[in-house]
Amino acid sequence: MNKAPLYGDVVSEFYDLLYPPTDVSHVVEYVRSRYPSGARIVDFGVGTGRTAIPLAIAGNHVHGIDISERMIEALRDKDPERGVTTEVGDFTHAVGDGTYDMCMIMNNTFFMILGHEERTQTLRAAYSFLKPGGRLVLETYAAHHYLRESSPITSITPLGAGDLLLLDKIDVDPIKQQLLALRSIVGRGNVATFVEISRFSLPQELDVLGRAAGFDIAERSRNWQGDPVDAAALSHVSEYVRR
């Protein structure tokens, strides 16, 4: 039986175009405001190092875990000085040593963990890495926008220098709390198509999962600058503290 390719292996070539580092300076400042002298950070689903590399340059010790070898290779190509330590592996089963200040799960990665048990395992893994009082940070899209959505959502977005187009068609299942996105990148004489599946949770659901794994919600904002959450927010940054 052929094994399905990993999501990260499929998108690694385009990942930095899909998620340009426009907010990275705010992420760096977010961490600096909590750890002025630098922090030990573990990044679950580190990808190409979009935020991990700038955090390391800013004086933090950053360790990244990703199941996709191609993602890790892309990170290493961008980080020849090896400022970010890396490992290829499934972070849902990772075991830490309790010495880290912060665990970051960025860019909707937590919602791409589809099973309840796998999410619980991920939070337990984060707990094992963190010191008492350490912080778990989840960056997710704002789920409430999709609760009443039943029609497909389509969009066209220029990428990079404008020579590529991203075509998105998102099917929403509000009962299963699931988004299925068919994404195509068109241009340069080529078409690349891939699928993203995510299962969203409301903030209160995340907080219940967190409490069961030993985390208490500390704050939630709509962005890395700390602006308050409201109905118009498109994303949430949720910070939890390890008991």
Predicted regions located by residue number:
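C-terminal lobe and adjacent flexible extensions of AdoMet/dcAdoMet transferase-like proteins
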Residues: 203-243
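Class I SAM-dependent methyltransferase SAM/SAH-binding core
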Residues: 49-93
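A short acidic, Gly/Pro-enriched loop at the edge of an enzyme's catalytic core
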Residues: 93-102
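SAM-dependent methyltransferase
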Residues: 137-208
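A short glycine-rich, Lys/Arg-flanked "PGG" loop and its adjoining helix->strand segment in the class I
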Residues: 120-132
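A short SAM/SAH-binding and catalytic strip from SAM-dependent methyltransferases
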Residues: 101-117
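Conserved class I S-adenosyl-L-methionine
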Residues: 1-47
